[in-house]
Design a protein with these regions (language model features):
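Conserved ABC ATPase "signature" region
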Residues: 30-48
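Catalytic Walker B motif of ABC-type/P-loop ATPase nucleotide-binding domains
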Residues: 78-81
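Conserved ABC ATPase signature
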Residues: 53-57, 61
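H-loop/switch region of ABC-family ATPase nucleotide-binding domains
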Residues: 114-115
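Hydrophobic anchor residue at the start of the ABC signature
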Residues: 67
């Protein structure tokens, strides 16, 4: 899925666009229809949009249509370039949770290209940081985000919550140094303040 979905959409209707891949895979009409419905639902596309021209859609809807077109083929390897760019926070979360679910259910490899360290911290278990066309860092979240100086040297940073927790540690709060998500920070901080992290 490309960063600019308008370069990926081309057919007369959103439905035809999503069906393009499965049709070229030689699938039957019933299977194509089922995959179109499934992929549209996965991407959060309302069924009322399926018979519209993809060029009438908003930017976020185009992104969802482009993702649906790829998902309809049920790929074993899925490469997405900034899949949540232009989506509101709920849309971002829906797309990334859907990708995580797809990966878990299908066993597919999902590769996401993104500048959002927050998204990468929440949804990726292995990271490769590119700089000038080469791999600059790679490893687990701990291995990559533990090198904040190296990340900053190329214009990236650790997630905001990681920086916040580092400041809290400097102030004396006994927090682990591997907090990369708001959820992990909440779970670590609330008990220290007498709250219940599970509430």
């Amino acid at each position: 899925v490309m960063q600019y979905p308008e370069y990926q959409l081309f057919d007369e209707t959103v439905r035809a666009d999503i069906a393009y891949g499965p049709r070229n895979m030689g699938l039957g009409a019933a299977e194509i229809d089922a995959r179109v419905a499934e992929a549209a639902s996965f991407a959060g596309l309302d069924a009322s949009l399926l018979d519209k021209s993809p060029f009438e859609l908003s930017g976020g809807q185009k992104r969802r249509a482009a993702i649906a077109g790829v998902m309809a083929m049920r790929p074993e390897i899925l490469v997405l370039d900034e899949p949540a760019a232009g989506l509101d926070p709920r849309g971002r979360e829906d797309i990334f949770k859907g990708l995580a679910r797809y990966r878990a259910e299908s066993g597919a490899t999902v590769i996401v290209v993104s500048h959002s360290m927050e998204d990468m911290a929440r949804y990726c278990d292995y990271l490769a940081v590119m700089n000038d066309g080469e791999i600059f860092l790679r490893g687990t979240q701990r291995e990559v985000f533990g090198k904040s100086d190296a990340l900053q040297s190329i214009g990236l940073d650790v997630p905001d919550v990681t920086r916040l927790c580092a400041l809290l540690r400097e102030g004396g709060m006994p927090l682990p140094d591997d907090i990369y998500t708001v959820e992990a920070a909440t779970a670590a901080i609330l008990p220290l303040l007498g709250g219940d992290a599970d509430a």
